[in-house]
Amino acid sequence: MCAQVWLLTDRLIREDYPQVQILRALRQRCSEQDVGFRAVFLDQIAVTVVGGHLGLQLSQKPLTTFPDVVVVRVSTPSVQSDSEITILRHLEKLGCRLVNRPQSILNCINKFWTFQELAGHGVPMPDTFSYGGHEDFSKMIDEAEPLGYPVVVKSTRGHRGKAVFLARDKHHLSDICHLVRHDVPYLFQKYVKESHGKDIRVVVVGGQVIGSMLRCSTDGRMQSNCFLGGVGVKCPLTEQGKQLAIQVSNILGMDFCGIDLLIMDDGSFTVCEANANVGFLAFDQACNLDVGAIIADYAMSLLPNRQTGKMAILPGLASPREKNEPNGCVSAQGVAESVYAITNGSTSSESEPELGEARDSSVKTMGAPPAHVAQAWLQH
C-alpha cells in the first residue's frame, strides 16, 4: 500500500509563505519518492464515529485509507479545542503521525500554558502571573505588585508581538486596563531590561537547532518581532542556548517550533515564548535557509520504514560556508555588532507594508509563483 502524506491547514492562511513553501517541498518529495500526497483544508474534513468505529470524510466522501503523516499548519491564536483540535485528535486516534501533535499545539496556544508545562524542569523563565476569569485584569494589578515596575503585560493568546504592553507604573497599568481585550486572560511578567528590543529566535526541527536569528526593534519598542517592523540577522548561538531551545522543544513535545530567548547581561538566556506554528519568511532570508524544505524532509523521514527524523535532517542542515563559521557566543558585544550589521544593510524585515512584496519575491525565488498558489492547493 502506498504511503500517504497530507499538508493540513486553514483555508485563510493557505497563501502565507510558510504554507506555500511546505506545500512545494512536500509535493516535490512525494512525487520523487512515489508517496501519495494531498493538500487539505480543515473545513473539508468531517469526523465520524459509526458502529463504534472512527471514520473520516474528505469533501463529503468517506475515506478507506488514512495518511501516515500529516503536517499541520493552523493559526494558533484562533485554535479552538472543540473545532481544530477535535479534528487533529481524531486523525491521531486513527493512527496518523501529526507534525505537530495536537497536545503540542495546545501547549503553545496559550502563553501561560507554555510556562505551566516548562515549570519544574529547570528552564529559566521570567516570573509570571496570570488569572482565570476574563474580567479579572483589574483585580490582578495589586496581585502583580511583587513583579515590580516596569512590568510586561501580554495577552495569553497574542501573536506577532501584538497585545503586548510595558507598564511603567501602577497608574499606567490601570490605564492599560481600558485598552485590553477582555475575551482572553492576560499575563503579567517580570521585565527583562537587558533584552529590551531584542531577542533570539531559534528554530528547532526534529530535536535539532537548524538556525538562530537575532531580532531587533528599530523604533525603541520592547517587541522585536519582524512583523512589527523589527529586523533580523543570522546570529550564532552558544551551546547553552541551543540546548535550552532543544530542551523547551522536547518538554512541549514539538516536532518543529520557534523558541524565543531573551538575552541576559552575562550571556545566558531566559525563555520568552514558544511557537508551534512558527513563521519563517524573515528567518529564511536572514539565515539563507529553506525551513519549508527541512520540515518536509523531516516529515518524509517519519514514514514507515524510513530513518528517524533526527538522522534524516542532519547531513544537509548547514552549507559548507556555515559549517566553517565559528560558533560564537551571543554576548553584549555580539549583540552590538549584530545590530550594527543590521543597520548597515544585512537586514531582513517582515513589517506589514512590505510583507506581501517580500513574500511574493521569496516565493518566486523558491519556485512557486504566487499567481498559481491558490490553484496549487486544488491539485491533489
UniProtKB/Swiss-Prot annotation:
<dbReference type="InterPro" id="IPR013815">
    <property type="entry name" value="ATP_grasp_subdomain_1"/>
</dbReference>
<dbReference type="GO" id="GO:0036211">
    <property type="term" value="P:protein modification process"/>
</dbReference>
<keyword id="KW-0460">Magnesium</keyword>
<protein>
    <recommendedName>
        <fullName>N-acetylaspartylglutamate synthase A</fullName>
        <ecNumber>6.3.2.41</ecNumber>
        <ecNumber>6.3.2.42</ecNumber>
    </recommendedName>
</protein>
<dbReference type="InterPro" id="IPR013651">
    <property type="entry name" value="ATP-grasp_RimK-type"/>
</dbReference>
<keyword id="KW-0479">Metal-binding</keyword>
<keyword id="KW-0547">Nucleotide-binding</keyword>
<feature type="binding site">
    <location>
        <position position="273"/>
    </location>
    <ligand>
        <name>Mg(2+) 1</name>
    </ligand>
</feature>
<feature type="binding site">
    <location>
        <position position="273"/>
    </location>
    <ligand>
        <name>Mg(2+) 2</name>
    </ligand>
</feature>
<feature type="binding site">
    <location>
        <position position="273"/>
    </location>
    <ligand>
        <name>Mn(2+) 2</name>
    </ligand>
</feature>
<keyword id="KW-0436">Ligase</keyword>
<feature type="region of interest" description="Disordered">
    <location>
        <begin position="345"/>
        <end position="370"/>
    </location>
</feature>
<feature type="domain" description="ATP-grasp">
    <location>
        <begin position="115"/>
        <end position="300"/>
    </location>
</feature>
<feature type="binding site">
    <location>
        <position position="260"/>
    </location>
    <ligand>
        <name>Mn(2+) 1</name>
    </ligand>
</feature>
<keyword id="KW-0464">Manganese</keyword>
<feature type="binding site">
    <location>
        <position position="260"/>
    </location>
    <ligand>
        <name>Mg(2+) 1</name>
    </ligand>
</feature>
<feature type="modified residue" description="Phosphoserine">
    <location>
        <position position="319"/>
    </location>
</feature>
<feature type="binding site">
    <location>
        <begin position="189"/>
        <end position="199"/>
    </location>
    <ligand>
        <name>ATP</name>
    </ligand>
</feature>
<feature type="binding site">
    <location>
        <position position="275"/>
    </location>
    <ligand>
        <name>Mg(2+) 2</name>
    </ligand>
</feature>
<keyword id="KW-0963">Cytoplasm</keyword>
<keyword id="KW-0067">ATP-binding</keyword>
<feature type="binding site">
    <location>
        <position position="273"/>
    </location>
    <ligand>
        <name>Mn(2+) 1</name>
    </ligand>
</feature>
<dbReference type="InterPro" id="IPR011761">
    <property type="entry name" value="ATP-grasp"/>
</dbReference>
<dbReference type="GO" id="GO:0046872">
    <property type="term" value="F:metal ion binding"/>
</dbReference>
<feature type="binding site">
    <location>
        <position position="215"/>
    </location>
    <ligand>
        <name>ATP</name>
    </ligand>
</feature>
<dbReference type="InterPro" id="IPR004666">
    <property type="entry name" value="Rp_bS6_RimK/Lys_biosynth_LsyX"/>
</dbReference>
<feature type="binding site">
    <location>
        <position position="154"/>
    </location>
    <ligand>
        <name>ATP</name>
    </ligand>
</feature>
<keyword id="KW-0597">Phosphoprotein</keyword>
<dbReference type="GO" id="GO:0005524">
    <property type="term" value="F:ATP binding"/>
</dbReference>
<comment type="function">
    <text>Catalyzes the synthesis of N-acetyl-L-aspartyl-L-glutamate (NAAG) and N-acetyl-L-aspartyl-L-glutamyl-L-glutamate.</text>
</comment>
<feature type="binding site">
    <location>
        <position position="275"/>
    </location>
    <ligand>
        <name>Mn(2+) 2</name>
    </ligand>
</feature>
<dbReference type="GO" id="GO:0072590">
    <property type="term" value="F:N-acetyl-L-aspartate-L-glutamate ligase activity"/>
</dbReference>
<dbReference type="GO" id="GO:0005737">
    <property type="term" value="C:cytoplasm"/>
</dbReference>
<comment type="similarity">
    <text>Belongs to the RimK family.</text>
</comment>
<dbReference type="Pfam" id="PF08443">
    <property type="entry name" value="RimK"/>
</dbReference>
